[in-house]
């Protein structure tokens, strides 16, 4: 029995993009975008962690909903945040707030990147037609 040839699955690209930022684009063969997105999103996460003194991604915080959009790297940083939080967290510090915001933006950005990977595979020819004048 011959099955029709299918390309990469958009759902797999979406899930891979959540686990590792940019992996959905790598799965689709867009290596340049994959590297760019991985570096940008992971860089935002690390910059936010450094700014916030390593205590910005913690369980039980509302911000984790946004930060969790960055997927695997965000959840991998939770034990580090827990370790640094044992010595106390300066919740009112501007650097802590800015670091928290950076990590949340990384999560939201990764959600957009995941949607891009999904849409490029689900609708490969959308937007390529020129409008008739």
PLM region spans:
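Alpha-helical transmembrane segments and their helix-start/interface "positive-inside/aromatic belt" motifs
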Residues: 30-38
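Hydrophobic, membrane-inserted alpha-helices
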Residues: 17-22
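Active-site beta-strand/loop microenvironment that shapes enzyme catalytic pockets
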Residues: 23-31
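Transmembrane helix recognition focused on a "late"/terminal membrane span
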Residues: 1-14, 37-133
């Amino acid at each position: 029995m011959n099955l029709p040839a299918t390309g990469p699955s958009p759902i797999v690209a979406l899930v891979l993009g959540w686990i590792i930022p940019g992996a959905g684009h790598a799965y689709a063969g867009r290596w340049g975008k994959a590297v760019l997105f991985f570096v940008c999103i992971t860089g935002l996460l690390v910059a936010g962690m450094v700014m916030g003194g390593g205590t910005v991604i913690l369980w039980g915080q509302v911000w984790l909903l946004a930060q969790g959009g960055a997927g695997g790297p965000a959840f991998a940083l939770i034990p580090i945040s827990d370790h640094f939080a044992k010595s106390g967290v300066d919740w009112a510090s501007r650097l802590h707030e800015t670091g928290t915001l950076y990590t949340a933006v990384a999560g939201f950005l990764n959600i957009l990147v995941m949607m891009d990977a999904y849409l490029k595979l689900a609708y490969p020819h959308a937007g390529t037609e020129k409008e008739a004048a």
